[in-house]
Amino acid sequence: MAEERVATRTQFPVSTESQKPRQKKAPEFPILEKQNWLIHLHYIRKDYEACKAVIKEQLQETQGLCEYAIYVQALIFRLEGNIQESLELFQTCAVLSPQSADNLKQVARSLFLLGKHKAAIEVYNEAAKLNQKDWEISHNLGVCYIYLKQFNKAQDQLHNALNLNRHDLTYIMLGKIHLLEGDLDKAIEVYKKAVEFSPENTELLTTLGLLYLQLGIYQKAFEHLGNALTYDPTNYKAILAAGSMMQTHGDFDVALTKYRVVACAVPESPPLWNNIGMCFFGKKKYVAAISCLKRANYLAPFDWKILYNLGLVHLTMQQYASAFHFLSAAINFQPKMGELYMLLAVALTNLEDIENAKRAYAEAVHLDKCNPLVNLNYAVLLYNQGEKKNALAQYQEMEKKVSLLKDNSSLEFDSEMVEMAQKLGAALQVGEALVWTKPVKDPKSKHQTTSTSKPASFQQPLGSNQALGQAMSSAAAYRTLPSGAGGTSQFTKPPSLPLEPEPAVESSPTETSEQIREK
């Protein structure tokens, strides 16, 4: 029995560990970043209220020393539009971590959004000292210099950004600089490189197509716009531009089909309704044209091109008082355009205000040094008032402009203007050999003459950050001459592109030019 007891004791030894004294638990120190994962999770889910609640709790625990919580709260403030508050929080982050280039970049970004571009440049330069190979710093420095109109420094910074890392947005801003400087060729070169780098970027393709459209290179314009629509069939900018090209060539029904697609995407677009209205004008549906143009004017009341077109349509409908109203409004916004004064003079002539019509014609002649139609209409008015000497002077000035256009271009004059000038020349006894009449190439075409419109090199770009064109025409009011009709002209104005890749930004095509015949 004793042996069994010994074996039992040997088989089950008594543990000595339980007899040792238990160690105390290590003290828990607050971890500043322990809630960062939860803050990040709420932020990327855009659950900002829950995110701010966690941030508040985290900052209370850490006594305001959690850098990430402050950083995310500053981002939320910026999204909510509280730029000044976000700036102060980002500055706090920069104090907590002075060697972080990201914090300085965010401080500079907030300064930029507040319009303090010089201060933003200083902070970006400090960030560049901490990280010299960050393309974003160079890009944003270039953007700041653009707003300060220091284009040379802006180009240097943007080129530096492209050397560090190529991005679509950098190409777009570099192209914007060339557009601001009026150098379309360099802008096209930049956008061509951008398209080579990013061939599926519809914004780049559309902008490049619009630049070619502005230069009158329709084949390349249509090619790039077509590529943009291939990648994005609902790209309303490209559709609007393509419709504008069709409208320019007189395909009004096809253009309206294109615009119907755009109307679903952007039903409140002023350029869209302007172009639709001028399509109806080309189809001689004047009531529909006025309705669409009135809607465009409601959406963009300060756009002078819409007012111009409204005046033009009312002139066509012989509603001269309404035409005077819209043309006067257009002149208030664009006081340096001679064609506006010419059409205003036509309206005044038909309203029997001859003295003011003469003043308007005189201003048109002073402002427009290239369009012979201004001088022709002025000569007609003077002839009808019995001032043959002054009428002859205007007629001779018209012939000089025609000769200049004939030497510099091969565009066509409208046959009605040719006929009217011949009648006036005969009445003034100077019309035996007009310098600008050419033989007709085939019986179906108009007279092969130089154009009544100015060549592209003489024209002022007519667009804004959207697609707006114009129907450039004129009407000479005859009373004593038997024809009783005025000259017409056809203009195709190039578009002016938006300066930034923003919705407002928005590059847009120009619209077609139409004709007006005023009896």
From Swiss-Prot:
PANTHER family: BARDET-BIEDL SYNDROME 4 PROTEIN, PTHR44186. The BBSome complex is thought to function as a coat complex required for sorting of specific membrane proteins to the primary cilia. The BBSome complex is required for ciliogenesis but is dispensable for centriolar satellite function. This ciliogenic function is mediated in part by the Rab8 GDP/GTP exchange factor, which localizes to the basal body and contacts the BBSome. Rab8(GTP) enters the primary cilium and promotes extension of the ciliary membrane. It comes from the Eukaryota. Belongs to the BBS4 family. This is BBSome complex member BBS4. Residues 1-66, 338-519 are annotated as: Required for localization to centrosomes. GO terms for biological process: adult behavior; B cell homeostasis; brain morphogenesis; centrosome cycle; cerebral cortex development; cilium assembly; dendrite development; erythrocyte homeostasis. InterPro entries: TPR-like_helical_dom_sf, TPR_rpt. The gene is BBS4. GO terms for molecular function: alpha-tubulin binding; beta-tubulin binding; dynactin binding; protein-macromolecule adaptor activity; RNA polymerase II-specific DNA-binding transcription factor binding. Ubiquitously expressed. The highest level of expression is found in the kidney. Residues 1-25, 440-519 are annotated as: Disordered.
